[in-house]
Amino acid sequence: MSKKLSRADFLKSTAAGAAAMTIVPNNVMGAAFGHKAPSDKLNIAGIGIGGRGASVLKDLEKENIVALCDTDWAYSKHIFERYPKAKRFYDWREMYDKIGSEFDAIMCATADHTHAIIASEAMNLGKHVYCEKPLTHSVYESRLLTKLTEKTGVATQMGNQGSSAEGVETVCNWIWNGEIGEVTHVEAFTDRPIWPQGLMTPKETHVVPDTLKWDLFLGPAKFRPYNNVYQPWNWRGWWDFGTGALGDMACHVLHPAFKALNLGYPTKVQGS
């Protein structure tokens, strides 16, 4: 068996998504001394970097962060400063066009309604994709990405820090080992205080800040006048941009129950 593993070979063989982005091959020259050859690192472009994307990028710092893209440069200022050598963009399409040959993978943590288009275009370019939850804005988009993954053969992963945390596995093991007895009822809730829920669409129009490209944030969504209530978090409460509290938090609070109890699709859903 050959002990040589180039970056190209690594990319062709990997199927572990973003987890693969942090793998350090043992056979890299000097690996025993903690050295990793520059040619063996992945070049990563971050899209949607001010919020959750900032945390994801910090976990990828063993690789090369070569490009950063966000529609709100004021909100992303701390990340631009953290990676001063990375090229900066407002528009992910411009980034793909200008430096698509300079990166191997993307990290996408934009507003929900733009996940599918950003990820699909990256996959069509042969780029590996790590996309934050919710994977897409609709089931239809998710099915399209699934087919595209099979077609392109790139490594993909949906990011969900809640399901990746140690606590979920611990609770699952308790249940699987019978340590708390038979589970017959589960209650889950969220008040999601980081953004107020049930907001009405604002009627007032505000001046768009110079550091924000509102048209680029809207992307495929229907145009609406800018109001500062939407940024940087509250867009989640409008279907044009987000998926509401259910799409934002259910994957965190319900996932442990679904995994531990091996639940299937719901048979009944009630809303009020």
List the predicted regions and their residue ranges:
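NAD(P)-dependent dehydrogenases' Rossmann-like dinucleotide-binding region
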Residues: 48, 179-197, 212-227, 267-272
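Rossmann-like dinucleotide-binding domain that binds NAD(P)(H)
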Residues: 215-272
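Flexible glycine/proline-enriched surface loops and loop-helix/loop-strand junctions
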Residues: 152-154, 198-201, 234-243
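Beta-strand-loop-alpha-helix segment that lines the small-molecule cofactor/substrate pocket
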Residues: 111-112, 116-164, 178
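N-terminal Rossmann-like dinucleotide-binding module
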Residues: 17-83, 162-165, 257
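N-terminal Rossmann-like NAD(P) cofactor-binding module of classical short-chain dehydrogenase/reductase
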Residues: 106-107
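N-terminal secretory signal peptides and thylakoid transit peptides that target proteins
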Residues: 1-18
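Basic phosphate/pyrophosphate-binding loop/patch that engages nucleotide-derived ligands
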Residues: 147-154, 172-184, 200, 205-208
